[in-house]
Amino acid sequence: MEWASNKKELEFVICTNLTLLDEKMVKYLKKHKCLISTSLDGPKDLHDTNRPLQNKELDHHAIFEKNLEMIRKIWCDDECASALMTTSRYSLGRFKDIIDEYVRLGFHNIFLRALNPYGFAKQHKDKIAYPVEDFILNFKEGLDYIIELNKKGVFFVEGYAALLLKRILTPFATGFVDLQSPAGVGIAGAIYDYDGSVYVADEGRMMARFKNYYFRLGNVNTDSYQSMFNGEKLHEIIRSACNECLPECAECVFQPYCGADPVRNLSEQGDMVGHRPTNEMCKKNKAIIHYLFELLERKDPEINRIFWSWIK
């Protein structure tokens, strides 16, 4: 980190479950302005169910809460640590509890996130997965609850809705690679693994853990920058990454607000183009965007005020 900072302008974020952090580590992170990203799946019972520690005697949620307080005290800033949640089967029906826990712990936003088809989530989908329709129903209920919190004076943002609203209500991009066309894979970002392998996205790296190396562009020890980022492999991926050209996406009324995801399509449906009628990402995005338009069409001044406060 110290070497890299002397070479170019960089921002660092460390991803951690907080369990192994101590004051010395946190002070080092603060010194180098390295922000902290963690995971919080809800109240203690739900968080510990979703994210069990190998040492069953440890109380994951209690350690999380204690170390979060320590981090904020050292930084003197509540925004130095952000959290992401993942929806498992056990989370369904409990979005209100999850949101309340985020509010209780001093977070001002949440990203109501469905399960992704990669890594251990895909490996254990028989235990933790659910129909996308169930997530959509829970998302709507969660969004309604967040709107009610804001009406009561509690400023709290639903992150995915805020990204979509920025695309709907303004001419500005969000930088969120899942809502880009062409997709951001390999052109808006790349992943460098510990062994020098370069992937178009972190999801490609996770697929490689299970012996699917399709999204590996090369290796920094053997391949040139030009061959990796202007090679036929990336060109082929990007050709399948523009929703203006994809079947059904090209004619979809929500196309300007959505994006393409060739990595997810290959993981879920076996090819980078995908099949929209059975595509879960497509179903989810259509339903959420449609619901946001429903809320906007109510012309409720309070809801409109809340939405604009999220994207300003």
What are these regions (language model features)?
Residues 30, 69, 103, 229-230, ...:
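Alpha-helix boundary recognition
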Residues 8, 32-33, 77, 106, ...:
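Short loop/turn motifs at secondary-structure junctions
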Residues 208-312:
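Flexible mid-to-C-terminal extensions adjoining Fe-S/redox cofactors in radical SAM and related proteins
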Residues 1-46, 53-63, 70, 85-97:
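Canonical radical SAM enzyme core domain
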Residues 201:
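Short acidic/histidine-rich active-site segments
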Residues 45-65, 69, 73-186, 191, ...:
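Radical SAM enzyme [4Fe-4S]-AdoMet core and its adjacent flexible, acidic
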